[in-house]
């Protein structure tokens, strides 16, 4: 917490704000508040309204104006001007190809703007891949060759018809094999923070150890580590089939230990 005197005394301000910490935000999000996707929003619906918009004037305006609070300008201000963040990864939410709240072209333009402002490359990009819908795996080559993505991002509980997949099901394996072929061997996977009861099993981490063992040359970044909102996390329970325990069990069962190719993320949960 920054003390009040830091606003008045240079020494107090330096003590509160100075430092050599390296801050890497591994999951940033924003949307295009006026993009084509908004034309398909049902009347009266308020997508992304769960986001804290305190202090943003657009939050009080009618219709979808509040989406400006989670748009590009606010993202740049919050992350690169008003915080000590050094590097950020810009990620994507699951969507159909036609309904992306943020396109890769818009993300790339933002990364270029940040680089021009800062003089260094500070915004890294995911490439969104939902391999259980037509066209996404086929588009991976374009993403890798033209947009300098650092990793792929997928959501295993999501599907265009509500049905998810495991990473060692056919869609997941196609995605992994294409990532290997293209040389971008970092795959970020949303696990946990489930979307609802449908396809719930695919939100768990039971498949992670299996694919990590099968593909030791691929890095698997497990966003949220299987954490389930509303369920407590206590001492490790090998019988639990979801939550962080399921990730631990899957890794132990497949011999993935310290220094392996699975990275458990909890900071953005």
Residue ranges, per PLM feature:
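An N-terminally biased module of ancient metal coordination in phosphate/nucleic-acid-related enzymes
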Residues: 1-91, 97-102
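Active-site gating/metal-coordination segments in enzymes
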Residues: 4-5, 87, 94-203, 268
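Alpha-helical scaffolding within the catalytic cores
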Residues: 9, 70-77, 107-112, 136-139, ...
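Extracellular/periplasmic catalytic domains that process cell-envelope and extracellular macromolecules
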Residues: 17-18, 81-83, 118-119, 145, ...
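A structural micro-motif
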Residues: 21-22, 86, 121-123, 185, ...
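Flexible loop residues that form catalytic
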Residues: 29, 34, 93, 157, ...
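Aromatic- and acidic-residue-enriched segments that line the glycan-binding/catalytic groove
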Residues: 36-48, 101-107, 146, 197-208, ...
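Catalytic pocket-lining loop regions of alpha/beta-barrel enzymes
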Residues: 150-151, 164-269
């Amino acid at each position: 917490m920054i003390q009040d005197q830091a606003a008045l005394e240079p020494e107090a301000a330096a003590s509160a704000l100075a430092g050599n910490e390296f801050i890497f935000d591994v999951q940033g999000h924003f949307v295009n508040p006026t993009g084509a996707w908004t034309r398909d929003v049902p009347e009266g619906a308020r997508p992304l309204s769960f986001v804290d918009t305190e202090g943003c004037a657009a939050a009080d305006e009618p219709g979808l104006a509040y989406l400006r609070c989670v748009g590009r300008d606010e993202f740049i201000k919050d992350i690169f001007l008003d915080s000590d963040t050094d590097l950020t990864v810009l990620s994507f939410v699951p969507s159909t190809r036609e309904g992306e709240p943020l396109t890769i072209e818009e993300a790339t333009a933002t990364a270029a703007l940040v680089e021009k402002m800062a003089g260094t490359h500070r915004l890294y990009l995911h490439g969104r891949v939902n391999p259980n819908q037509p066209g996404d795996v086929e588009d991976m080559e374009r993403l890798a060759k033209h947009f300098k993505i650092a990793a792929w991002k997928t959501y295993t509980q999501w599907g265009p018809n509500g049905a998810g997949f495991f990473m060692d099901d056919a869609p997941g394996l196609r995605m992994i094999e294409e990532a290997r072929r293209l040389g971008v061997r970092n795959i970020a996977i949303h696990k946990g923070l489930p979307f609802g009861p449908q396809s719930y099993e695919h939100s768990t981490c039971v498949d992670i150890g299996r694919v990590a063992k099968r593909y030791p040359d691929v890095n698997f970044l497990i966003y949220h580590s299987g954490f389930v909102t509303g369920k407590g996390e206590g001492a490790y329970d090998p019988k639990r089939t979801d939550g962080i325990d399921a990730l631990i069990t899957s890794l132990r069962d497949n011999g993935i230990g310290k220094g392996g190719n699975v990275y458990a993320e909890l900071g953005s949960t």
